[in-house]
Regions:
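Zinc-dependent deaminase
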Residues: 1-20, 36, 69, 82-150
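Short loop/turn microsegments at loop-to-beta-strand junctions
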Residues: 2, 23-26, 74
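Small-residue (primarily alanine) positions within well-ordered alpha-helices
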Residues: 10, 14-17, 27, 38, ...
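Short beta-strand scaffold segments in enzyme catalytic cores
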Residues: 25-34
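Short beta->alpha transition motifs characteristic of CBS
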Residues: 37-45
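Residues that line or immediately flank small-molecule/substrate-binding pockets and catalytic motifs
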Residues: 44, 78, 102
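Helix-adjacent hinge/juxtasegments
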Residues: 48-51, 56, 60-91
Length: 150
């Protein structure tokens, strides 16, 4: 499977969230054998939980699946640049690689004005790859917010 294949699955998850009225962000975590071990989408409204972002949900599932708080040889694919909370969870879980689609210039933790991974308190920095399926990811999030804020 390729980076684009995993991002396509993350996009499918984002659309599931969109169907429920959530901000459409989807996520997939794969192990070292490139097998999907968890996937999710934003469930903030559904769970009445401001921390129920796609990345947090998928990290929790992956940790349970692997019976470990560390995801050392795993990669995470997410349709939108992670926020600071999600970046901290990515760091704490020791994910090896982060792939994301669209930049988030408002709340992003990498290109959005504050790079969490460059702070002195960040104890693990994943390999970071941006702009995976960028156009599709940007269109999805931009169309959602155009509908909310005309």
């Amino acid at each position: 499977m390729t980076q684009n294949t995993f991002m396509e699955q993350a996009l499918i998850n984002a659309f599931k969230g969109l169907d429920l009225g959530e901000v459409p962000v989807g996520c997939v975590i794969v192990n070292q054998d490139n097998k999907i071990i968890s996937q999710s989408y934003n469930k903030v409204i559904a769970d009445n939980d401001p921390t129920a972002h796609a990345e947090i949900n998928a990290i929790r599932q992956a940790c349970v699946s692997l019976k470990s708080e560390r995801l050392i040889d795993c990669s995470i694919y997410v349709t939108l640049e992670p926020c600071i909370m999600c970046a901290a969870a990515i760091s704490k879980s020791k994910l090896k690689r982060l792939y994301y689609g669209a930049d988030d210039m408002n709340f992003g933790s990498i290109n959005g004005g504050f790079n969490f991974f460059q702070t002195k308190n960040c104890n693990h920095v994943p390999e970071i790859y941006d702009s995976i399926s960028k156009i599709q990811c940007e269109n999805l999030i931009n169309d959602f917010f155009k509908g909310k804020r005309p």
